[in-house]
C-alpha cells in the first residue's frame, strides 16, 4: 500500500487472454491497430476500475493535454474523478492550462471545446488563462474566484484529489503549481 514492496505495472494490459506479445517477430496485421474496435478494452477498463474502487485500490491517471480539448472528454474524466475512480493525477502544465482554459473561456488551444471551431484570436486564450491564474496565485484560488465549475483540474480540486504537474522546457507560463524542474516533479 505504501509502495515499499514496489509498484505493480501491468505491461501487457491490452493483450487478450492467451495472446502473446509479438513485438520481436515480423508479422502484418496479426494484432490490434487504430483500425481495430476497442469496445472490449473499454469494458475491461471499466471492470478494472470498479474492482480497484471496491477493493480500495489507488488509481493514478497520467493524462496529456488532448484529454482537455473536447467538452465531453473533460466531462467524462471529471466524472471519473468525482465518482472516486482517481486517487491521483500526473500531468503537465499543458493539461492543466488547456483544461482550465476550457472552464474559463470555453476553448482549448483557442478552439471551442464543443465544436472545435477556432475562436478569433483564440490562440492567445491559453496565455490569458495562465495570466489570470498567476494573478490569483494558485489554481484553487482561480477556480473559486472565476467560478469554474467543470473539468479535470476543477474536479481534482473539488474532491481533494492530489495532482502533480510536471514542467517541460516548452511550457508557457507555467502555472503556479507546476514543478519547473523535471527531476523535482518526478520525485514528487
Predicted regions and their residues:
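Metallocofactor- and cofactor-centric catalytic cores in central/energy metabolism, strongly enriched
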Residues: 1-124, 131-166, 174-188
Amino acid at each position: 500500500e505504501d509502495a515499499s514492496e514496489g509498484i505493480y505495472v501491468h505491461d501487457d494490459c491490452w493483450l487478450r487472454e492467451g495472446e502473446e506479445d509479438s513485438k520481436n517477430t515480423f508479422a502484418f496485421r496479426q494484432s490490434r491497430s487504430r483500425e481495430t474496435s476497442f469496445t472490449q478494452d473499454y469494458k475491461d477498463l471499466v471492470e478494472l476500475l470498479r474492482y480497484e474502487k471496491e477493493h480500495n485500490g489507488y488509481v493514478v491517471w497520467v493524462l496529456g493535454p488532448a484529454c482537455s480539448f473536447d467538452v465531453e472528454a473533460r466531462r467524462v474524466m471529471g466524472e471519473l474523478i468525482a465518482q472516486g475512480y482517481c486517487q491521483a493525477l500526473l500531468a503537465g502544465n499543458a493539461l492543466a492550462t488547456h483544461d482550465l482554459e476550457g472552464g474559463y473561456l470555453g476553448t482549448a488551444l483557442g478552439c471551442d471545446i464543443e465544436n472545435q471551431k477556432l475562436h478569433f484570436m483564440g490562440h492567445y486564450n491559453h496565455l490569458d488563462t495562465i495570466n489570470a491564474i498567476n494573478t490569483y496565485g494558485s489554481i484553487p484560488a482561480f477556480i473559486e474566484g472565476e467560478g469554474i465549475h467543470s473539468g479535470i483540474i476543477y474536479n481534482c480540486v473539488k474532491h481533494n484529489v492530489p495532482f502533480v504537474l510536471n514542467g517541460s522546457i516548452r511550457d508557457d507560463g507555467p502555472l503556479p503549481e507546476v514543478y519547473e524542474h523535471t527531476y523535482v516533479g518526478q520525485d514528487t
